[in-house]
Amino acid sequence: MDTRRAFAIAACLALAACGGSGGGGGGTTGGGTGGTTTPPPPPAYTDSNTYSSGGSSSLASPNEITAVTKHSLVIGANTLNYTATVGHLTAMTLANPTPEASFFYIAYTLDGASPGTRPVTFFYNGGPGSATVWLHLGSFGPKRLATNAPSTTTPTPFAFVDNTESLLDVSDLVFVDAVGTGFSEAIAPNLNRTFWGTDVDAQVFRDFVMRYVAVNGRASSPKFLFGESYGTPRSSILVNLLESAGTQMTGVVLQSSILNYNSNCGVFDTVTISCYAYVPSYAAVGAWLGLVTPPQPVAQLPAYMALMRPYASNVYDPAVRAWMAGTAPSGTIVTQLAADTGMSAGNWSAHFNMDPGYFHDNLVPGSVIGFYDGRMVAQRGTPLAADDDPSSTFYNDSFSSTIVSYLSNDLHYTTPSTYTISSNAINVWDFSHAGLQFPDTVPDLAAAIAQNPKLEVFSANGYHDLVTPFYNTEGDLARLGAPNANISVHFYEGGHMTYLDDVGRQQEKAELAAFYASTASTKVAEAAVPAAPSQPFAETPRPTGTMPAAAFEMKLRDPMLPPSLRGLKPTPPSTGDALRAEVEQRLQSLFDSARPKRAGLVTLEEARAAGLGYIANNFQAIDTRGAGAVSFDDVKRFMRARGATTLPN
């Protein structure tokens, strides 16, 4: 066996956290005050492990060998020299650390910056069952595919260009694939499907983030999560778990959210809830396509949406509820909806509680529009309409071919395995969470803020997204109180992947940079300094092997439910005292996970053994009586004293 690999496996299985080269997690290169020196990388190698996305698959012998390369990027007046680190890192259980899963990741770290103060952001897509190729190659990494959205005539494959809107000038970037996607796989005796559920998925992501932080000396770094689509409920649960485990986070970016499956009418086949929150998005799409009356210029879109929000809530929604009870809508409402959205009055009369699938099929006769981006249109019978969503089909080939060539040619990582862009995990996914059959993660986000009142949330939304409509997200977040000092909500031209639109991406980058700079714990961080000059460095040589083409195991539609669940009935969202009780329940369940020997009391040792770092790190302050054990009421009092406002009195 290769001695490097043998060492990596031994380190992986024996240590919960290590600081050596086995982790390979992207330490910075010398040249900056407080910076560390990355040891020379190993020689060129092809990762000979065979990775599988199958539900019954698992990895017998993980390794943590990495490919390390040097690059530069010009943003504005600054040239940023950075290190790319590609490979696997093992997530360990909190209690009695044992290997769970081997996560495939790509980290980009700024040369010369101090890891103690430099922000680090963890990116992931959703699905569930989607690899992070979309955020990695489309959003704020150092390179991106130039898609020119919403055009459907841009030559493909798209040009792969330096990304002048990258977030690398404000944060180190870690793109990580979920278990059973990309090259990430469970470690035996676990199986991939062991982690295919709302709760277990968030738990194993927690363990990856904590391991990465420990291996790479990032405990004091400002830390951010950046999840898209299903990645947003993952983020809400994950940030609560991280805070409870004692890993304090600085911020969460929610890209195109579905925080509560139960509030999104587009998730279900049997529409038992009002689709009112989609109406502003319908109007935005109709306006872009020139179908509304009177016409609405693109520059006036925010003002148009400001009119459509109250109309959807105060006029359309009550009419839908009356329609569900048997009262036909008035002709006035139907006529106004037709003018506002471009959908015919006849279609509104026939399908008054209009779901996005019907809108997608019927807005443009003879054509389909995109779900991910309603501005994209394809005539039925053409290749672009073959998978029923031109805003997915048009991008798939370029993203799938580029990830393979980029990994091998630029980042010097190869494996004989197939990179899985979308697995079939969703067909067996356990969506239940906190007693509900479909996740409502607004209470989890509130519980995280209760533990860390300084946590800040950035919600990014596309006006033309027909999968996770922006007004639905506004309603979900409004349950936490509006205005809420912890939460900022932002809107952009574009669809689900706002960053594919050049205008939307530039605006989002500017607002994200301001968000990072304004967060309390990053004000002293090296957030926007140019990199130090690149130091002499022996890169991992480019391997001679080639990789198979990337694969889609199923048609991409994120977020969604499998057919077996789409006919079930959602649960109405909680508000007020009921919501606060749910927040308390989330925190109580974490407290109870310590399984205290004395009912209702947890000792310092029990908190540590259970991985409850929040309690362990603050134990003396929580234990005001000096009893050597604390109750959940003691923990709540401590949270309130630190500014928590989402807990019951």
Question: Model-predicted segments: where are they?
Answer:
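C-terminal motif of bacterial Sec signal peptides marking the signal peptidase cleavage site
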Residues: 14-17
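N-terminal cap/lid subdomain of alpha/beta-hydrolase-fold enzymes
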Residues: 42-54, 97-194, 478
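A catalytic-pocket lid/entrance helix-loop region that shapes and gates access to the active site
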Residues: 142-146, 240-340
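Alpha/beta-hydrolase fold nucleophile elbow
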Residues: 217-230
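Alpha/beta-hydrolase fold catalytic core
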Residues: 322-467, 479
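Catalytic histidine-centered segment of alpha/beta-hydrolase-like enzymes
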Residues: 495-505
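Primarily EF-hand calcium-binding motifs
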Residues: 584-599, 615-627
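Acidic Ca2+-chelating loop motifs
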Residues: 596-608, 625-636
